[in-house]
Amino acid sequence: MREILHLQAGQCGNQIGAKFWEVISDEHGIDPSGTYHGDNELQLERINVYYNEATGGKYVPRAVLVDLEPGTMDSVRSGAFGQIFRPDNFVFGQSGAGNNWAKGHYTEGAELVDSVLDVVRKEAESCDCLQGFQLTHSLGGGTGSGMGTLLISKIREEYPDRIMNTFSVVPSPKVSDTVVEPYNATLSVHQLVENTDETYCIDNEALYDICFRTLKLTTPTYGDLNHLVSATMSGVTTCLRFPGQLNADLRKLAVNMVPFPRLHFFMPGFAPLTSRGSQQYRALTVPELTQQMFDAKNMMAACDPRHGRYLTVAAIFRGRMSMKEVDEQMLNVQNKNSSYFVEWIPNNVKTAVCDIPPRGLKMSSTFIGNSTAIQELFKRMSEQFTAMFRRKAFLHWYTGEGMDEMEFTEAESNMNDLVSEYQQYQDATAEEEGEGEEEGDEEVA
């Protein structure tokens, strides 16, 4: 079996991670004690990817939970599925990172990282053939960003040929916890560009907009945001957890999605969007799902795909539906909006279908786009970073932990390079096509 080892770091990472395990345990028919109560052999066929079968037929998540303070871990442990995790896999410090990337990466986090790696090794040894790692974390705080990226680089050293996949929650000015988020996020992206194979950018701003506009929630809570994140995570991992042909492992997904190694930041989307507790009962048609899925308002990253072009796209449809109809609809989208797909990668849209829909829905679709418009997110981050860094605001918190200003400058220029690379491929055309692209701002339908 091709196993995936899951890591969650920091408060945000542990909260969305715990929610992810609730959702997929439910989809695989596993109750909070780790016992299988399902009704479909498909649920068990690839259960080993995410779960270890322990004695007495119990299924235990291949998950390592990390934090620099005990608080969030305690709430995960006392949460709905808290008892399903292996107790030894909770690794936590007492000091906290105080939203300081340097503490997570160089001081506090560096002290804890070896005990985390011990647990990771132990989990990796129980794997038959480990395909890679996935990390849930946020980029705005101290632990998820600083220690999360430290873990990534340490794991990279030890398992250089395994795929590294992250679900990274990107800070946004509208939903801000901390004034130093732009520093933490820029320093993290500096690491992610070099050390991960696939990063799903999940953006609080986009999640808030979805809650306000589409779900009509007047005061969205983190619970509502996490509900959206877990639906998306469940969707993008469907191909890895259920039998299927397309993108059935992390490496195949990377091969299909990443045309240039640095450009591996994906924009996820989900349809139909439903709020917690009120899953819609009206059946959606395949055309509606396809239309919604490509709609800018459904993207989980606050970038408008109409401002850029898709390098590659993967779509996952779930539920009982006609493959023929799915293929027709996907072709239809590409033909109608051909200017939004780069013409120098033919067949750059791939589609997978899985029979088992998520709970409460007849069918759903998940979207993974590698779009040049993601540069908007990095630009936004970079502008905020520069505004503070020019004045050296708050820098003493970082230099006090032994960091050098040079590292800030490098991170800043690496991020700006990333933006220019996206721009370069957005403008590139196939030679014979010339520059005859007219960019309309019409709705992508």
From Swiss-Prot:
Region (Disordered): 421-445
Originating species: Pseudopleuronectes americanus (Winter flounder)
Main location class: cytoplasm
A Pfam family hit: Tubulin_C
Residues where 5-glutamyl polyglutamate is found: E438
Family: Belongs to the tubulin family.
Binding site for Mg(2+): E69
Domain notes: The MREI motif is common among all beta-tubulin isoforms and may be critical for tubulin autoregulation.
PANTHER family with a match to the protein in the record: TUBULIN
Binding of GTP, residues: Q11, E69, S138, G142, T143, G144, N204, N226
Keyword Signal attached: no
Subunit structure: Dimer of alpha and beta chains. A typical microtubule is a hollow water-filled tube with an outer diameter of 25 nm and an inner diameter of 15 nM. Alpha-beta heterodimers associate head-to-tail to form protofilaments running lengthwise along the microtubule wall with the beta-tubulin subunit facing the microtubule plus end conferring a structural polarity. Microtubules usually have 13 protofilaments but different protofilament numbers can be found in some organisms and specialized cells.
Tissues where the protein occurs: Brain.
InterPro entries: Beta-tubulin_BS, Beta_tubulin, Tub_FtsZ_C, Tubulin, Tubulin/FtsZ-like_C, Tubulin/FtsZ_2-layer-sand-dom, Tubulin/FtsZ_GTPase_sf, Tubulin_C
Name this protein carries in UniProt: Tubulin beta chain
GO cellular component: cytoplasm; microtubule
Localization of this protein: Cytoplasm, Cytoskeleton
Biased composition range(s): Acidic residues: 429-445
Molecular-function annotations in GO: GTP binding; GTPase activity; metal ion binding; structural constituent of cytoskeleton
Cofactor field: Mg(2+)
Protein keywords: Cytoplasm, Cytoskeleton, GTP-binding, Isopeptide bond, Magnesium, Metal-binding, Microtubule, Nucleotide-binding
PTM per Swiss-Prot/TrEMBL: Some glutamate residues at the C-terminus are polyglycylated, resulting in polyglycine chains on the gamma-carboxyl group. Glycylation is mainly limited to tubulin incorporated into axonemes (cilia and flagella) whereas glutamylation is prevalent in neuronal cells, centrioles, axonemes, and the mitotic spindle. Both modifications can coexist on the same protein on adjacent residues, and lowering polyglycylation levels increases polyglutamylation, and reciprocally. The precise function of polyglycylation is still unclear.
GO biological process: microtubule-based process
